[in-house]
């Protein structure tokens, strides 16, 4: 036909997903940072996917040139409906780096959140003034000017796992594809565009480069001569809070548009 439109709505439930969870200490396991042998696979999770898929096309002839335009739109929402134990959190993503203590997970599976949810400490720039330093040292007595400011989200005067918050997921809000095909006599032309919007990515390479003081950003980090910078000051301790994995500092917008084929 000259034109067409197709719309699909769906909902799919998956039960008893096979997931890797940490072996409890009561089982005699000794967890080792950066290793995986303290984890085992078991069926513990239920997942729900729901969304919409739209496909459309339009054919038209411009004299001797035949064309076809087609597009598709996909929006999928998923969330972990439940895990086997109430309030359980399954750590699902560790940055791919060598440093042992920096392998604190940044992605989790938790009831009510999407798959690949980033649950990390929120940061609020760097400590820039003596007044900010004095206030922040109530949370971290070892803090210095130029350090990242972690947010005490629950307001209890302490920084711990309870302060970690949901900061997006690697699941996109939607995906779009657009194709153009044209034919003139013995000549064919086609181009495909693809776009993703709303997904969050964790820049592990940036985190590693910061921790080893090899990232070009660090030239512009906070100093007394550059007092407005939100790039944290490099520290000699590679486990310093400025380069810890589990903060939103290394999260980035993963949206993009690209030409897939031409």
Give the predicted meaning of each segment.
Residues 1-262:
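Outer/extracellular conduits and scaffolds centered on Gram-negative outer-membrane beta-barrels
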